[in-house]
Amino acid sequence: MAKICLLRLFWLGVAKMKTKIVIISGITASGKTALSIELAKQFNAEIISADSRQVYQGLDIGSAKITPAEMQGIPHHCLDIIDPTQNTLYSVGDFQRDAYTTIDQISARGKVPMLVGGTGLYTRSVAEGYGFGDEPNNPRYEVLQICLMPPKNLIAPKVEQRNKERVANGMFEETRDLLARGVPSGFLYKLGLEYRLNVRYLQGEIDLPTYYNELYHQTMQFIKRQRTWYRKENPAYTHYLTDPSTYLATATQLIQQFLVK
């Protein structure tokens, strides 16, 4: 009888164990993608993109979507899952539903689910188990969040350079192709930042110098809002990294400690 009780207690404990997930979040141009690939290779992880624009097919350059070569064989999820010609916005509830399903599938394969992206509402909806409507929050997972927050003096030149590189790599042509495929200009406008300004430039509303100036300043304003958001993350599971030179070593140590506890 005593053995049966002990077994019941053991299996009840197992049933109550929560799946562990790692979140790599942070401001725009902070280095999330490169860090996540190195960490995924180390910890046998699969990556779930947590970016509100990378879910759309064809929005590649303007959303800074990871390329197949950059993935280095690491499986990625929640990319290119919505046809933008349908003019359908993908909500935080949609993301949470898809993330839950994908996390459980990754965990069932014996791998580490890793959410990566700068859409803070997406990652928080999963970490905190947001309830919608009258539903209370119901956190499903044990969470470690590593949030990249390098200082402005490091980010500003990266933003300026990144903007020029993306235009050189065909960002205007990408937007022109999306419009030609039937993606409404109003839909791209709603996506903000690059795509809104791309449409304005292609329609002749602004010239190239104005485009670059507005894109830089609007991106920096967006990053400022991201910083405000991320400073309010749950301190119980969030660690802030500010020095890119120590990202990998510090994140590796944090994840090792998290996975073995």
Please annotate each region the language model reported.
Residues 6, 16-44, 141-261:
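Catalytic core of IPPT-family isopentenyl/dimethylallyl transferases
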Residues 105-160, 164-168:
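Phosphate/Mg2+-binding loops and adjacent switch elements
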Residues 96-100, 120, 152-153, 172:
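Amphipathic alpha-helical transducer elements in NTP-driven molecular machines
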Residues 53-54, 120-121, 196:
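Alpha-helix/helix-capping structural signal
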Residues 51, 79, 118, 170, ...:
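Residue-level signal for inorganic ion chemistry
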Residues 2, 14-15:
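Acidic, Ala/Val/Gly-enriched low-complexity intrinsically disordered segments
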Residues 33-114, 124-135:
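N-terminal phosphate/diphosphate-binding loop that engages ATP/GTP or pyrophosphate donors
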